[in-house]
Amino acid sequence: MKRYITLALSVLMVLNSCSQMLDIYPRSAISPDGVTANDLSALRYGVYSAMQNKPGTTGYMCFDLLGGDITQKNYNPIDIYNGYMKTLGSNVTDQWNSFYNELYHVNVLLAAVEKAGIEANKVIYGEAHYFRAMIYMNLVTRWGGVPILRVNTSDRVARDTVEDCWDFINEELQLAIDNLETSTDMYMVSKEAAQALAARAYLYQGNMTKAAELAEGLITSGKYALEKDFSKIFGYERKANSETIFAFRMDDTETSVKLGSQYFTYDYVNKGSGWYFPTQTIINLFGANDTRLPVSVVTVGTDKCMGKYPGGQAYSDPIIISRIGEIYLISAEALGFPDGCERLNQLRRMRGLSDSTASSEAELKEAVLQ
């Protein structure tokens, strides 16, 4: 009997020891249901990483390709469009999967913030809503109405309408604006970043009043200013500048997205694969004195290369999401003719161009598009 009692006590001691070991906080991975306040910082930066990297190179180039702004040698832009838009092709399916993968990460973060307490984590809460709005703007502008997932689910869900998606985006951006703080770092989401994205969203929806209100608020805040030296924004030795509202840092230790590698040829100082080039139509839109031209289009050998991502194969360049130059254009279009002409001309003068001669709403819109 004594032997059995001793054995039982030994088993209990082992079980108790195992229990203590199993109670140790996990260090390498954790399920969404097990997330606590201790995980918020890691989750937050995980979301930043997913948002920067998941779209992939073609995700960032999507609208330039589909709009005919860039093309491949010996191809017409329409050929690129037809090849890119194959329904079952990876260019389409990879983006769809990537955006919903990003959404999964954001929803996990939001659930964790709500569990830990929103008031104590308002900035992270605001960042998550900003990113969810960005994801749905990417989705709705590519596919129209898509399923709105406020929480993660493995169930099959129906597509929501385009109108529902835009309403959701507006709601998300307002939550972001209400909870974020003013910018101190262009690589972190801020109240101004949310206002800039909201201005773009309302312009897309045709709500010119709200778009103009948000754009004018940013312009008149005095926090941002147009850069006379365009190379400070996109040049080889780009620096912190007065124009950028929010950008993805694209740190080489965390990303494989190197847009410059796609745009520069191997003869370039930082090398490149030279897959895509600006079309001559786009190059012709630059005026002779346009200060953007020598930064945006760089000659390498006999090739005209896209110059905004000078890292080539050597390093990743920041990807700008919002800058005050865009906000001037949003304001000009939203205010319309004639009120928007001055905002457009302020931007044109800073880029070395003469004032627009637009004399109607249609001409102003055309000038904005150029």
Segments (PLM) and residue ranges:
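Sec-dependent bacterial lipoprotein signal peptides
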Residues: M1-N16
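Long, intrinsically disordered, low-complexity segments
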Residues: C18, F99, F168, R249, ...
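Membrane-proximal, proline-rich intrinsically disordered regions
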Residues: C18-Y60, A215
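Short, surface-exposed recognition loops and adjoining beta-strand edges that mediate ligand/DNA contacts
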Residues: S28-G34, T58-Y75, V146, R150, ...
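Conserved, well-structured interaction surfaces
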Residues: S41, Y45, N76-W143, D155, ...
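Hydrophobic-face positions in mid-chain alpha helices that act as interaction patches
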Residues: T71-Y81, A215-I320
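Structural register within alpha-helical repeat arrays
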Residues: Y125, R132, A198, I324, ...
